[in-house]
Amino acid sequence: MGSLIIEDLQESFGKEAVKGKEITVHYTGWLEDGTKFDSSLDRRQPLTITLGVGQVIKGWDEGFGGMKEGGKRKLTIPSEMGYGAHGAGGVIPPHATLIFEVELLKVYE
């Protein structure tokens, strides 16, 4: 089993994302071969989620933890923390490692 790799691309001093908080993010996701499979930036529509409650893949729930508003990270997410043996929607193959660049836009109180 692989482990989540978190690389801070841009640190910030805004409010911190913690479990149970609602956050708004921008993201772009790629497969290991460089194939882009999704991007909120391309749609110009950020995503709002509640962190740490299973609304998103485990790699996101853990990868956004401790991040601060305005920060950017690269998350390399092993299959077990992504979509596993099933893949997703015909776009993400089974057992795929996922690479995301994410930006934390807002942490709500």
Swiss-Prot record:
Its EC number(s): 5.2.1.8
InterPro entries membership: PPIase_dom_sf (IPR046357), PPIase_FKBP_dom (IPR001179)
Span of domain PPIase FKBP-type: 20-108
Family matches, as Gene3D superfamilies: 3.10.50.40
Pfam families per UniProt: FKBP_C
UniProt-recorded Gene Ontology molecular function terms: peptidyl-prolyl cis-trans isomerase activity
Keyword tags: Isomerase, Rotamase
Isomerase as UniProt keyword: yes
GO biological process, one term: protein folding
Reaction catalyzed: [protein]-peptidylproline (omega=180) = [protein]-peptidylproline (omega=0)
Family: Belongs to the FKBP-type PPIase family.
Function: PPIases accelerate the folding of proteins.
Protein name as annotated: FK506-binding protein
Source organism of the structure: Neisseria meningitidis serogroup C
